[in-house]
A protein has these predicted regions:
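Outer-membrane beta-barrel signature, preferentially recognizing the C-terminal barrel domain
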Residues: 1, 76, 80-123, 149-171, ...
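Outer-membrane beta-barrel translocator/channel fold
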Residues: 46-76, 80-88
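Outer-membrane beta-barrel and related beta-rich outer-membrane complex signature
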Residues: 25-29, 52, 65-77, 134-138, ...
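Acidic helix/loop microenvironments that form the catalytic cleft of cell-wall polysaccharide enzymes
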Residues: 17-21, 63-65, 182-184
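Conserved small-residue
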Residues: 151, 170-235
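Surface-exposed loop/turn segments flanking beta-strands in extracellular/periplasmic regions
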Residues: 1, 73-95, 136, 141-149, ...
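Surface-exposed extracellular loop regions of Gram-negative outer-membrane beta-barrel proteins
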Residues: 3-27, 31-46, 104-107, 115-122, ...
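Outer-membrane beta-barrel transmembrane domain signature of Gram-negative proteins
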Residues: 1-12, 58, 62-63, 75, ...
Length: 235
């Protein structure tokens, strides 16, 4: 779904909506997922009188939700193949019927300015996004017939600024243009799975640290560890 509207060539509104049906959601209570976005921009240089030095001015803002599915077979796991023994074994992950897509909710605001007859231009943007419903595996009692269960939790936040400054002009048939950019991004693990509930035992989960792999050979290279309050690049 896409909707666009404008008012007097000064205000511009864009609204989108998308609904996906994913086969990975089979055997789950949620059969599809919807995610919208909305954006609004205003041409200040057309709405109000600005100083002569400013030839163009626009402000903009947007809010977006992007959804993505999880790995296959989490709602209906099949037999697992062991590449060492070349045998098939019963699934070890407890099947879940309430899986939800991972979602990233983001918003940004920006400003575009042009000066001195469009010779100089400035573009500034601030953004923030939060990624939710990440998939974690937690241990469960062997009496359940499985080794692990899936928990969806987590909150990883990204925020930053982007600045771009440009110059463009012509003299007697000779043109010159140059641009400079600056970006700054910071990410933070706001939450892992702590505070969630084990779907099998009903007990509260304590997970404020998670090992996600090695930067090379196992037990030799540095290890990447996620901790609540840390960043995605902590080692």
């Amino acid at each position: 779904m896409l909707f666009r509207s404008s008012w007097k060539n000064q205000l511009y509104l864009t609204v989108t909506g998308r609904n996906d049906w994913d086969s990975k959601l089979a055997f789950s209570k949620q059969k599809s997922f919807f995610y919208p976005s909305v954006g609004l921009s205003a041409l200040l240089s057309e709405m109000v009188k600005l100083p002569e030095v400013i030839s163009y001015a626009k402000i903009r803002g947007s809010y977006t939700v992007v959804a993505s599915s999880f790995d296959r077979f989490l709602t209906n796991p099949g037999y697992e193949y062991n590449s060492q023994t070349h045998n098939w074994a019963n699934p070890t992950v407890y099947p879940m019927d309430n899986m939800k897509p991972e979602k990233t909710k983001s918003w940004e605001i920006g400003l575009n300015l042009k000066f001195w007859g469009n010779r100089f231009n400035l573009d500034a943007t601030y953004y923030r996004s939060n990624t939710l419903n990440q998939t974690f595996k937690v241990d469960i009692p062997s009496s359940s017939g499985y080794k692990q269960a899936i928990v969806q939790a987590g909150n990883v936040q990204n925020q930053g600024i982007e600045l771009a400054l440009g110059f463009s002009d012509k003299w007697a048939g000779f043109g010159w243009s140059s641009n400079a950019t600056f970006t700054l991004n910071r990410n933070k693990v706001k939450r892992l799975a702590s505070g969630s509930v084990n779907p099998v035992t009903g007990e509260a989960i304590q997970m404020d640290e998670m090992n996600v792999g090695w930067l090379g050979k196992e037990n030799v290279a540095p290890r990447v560890i996620l901790t609540e309050g840390g960043s995605m690049t902590d080692i």
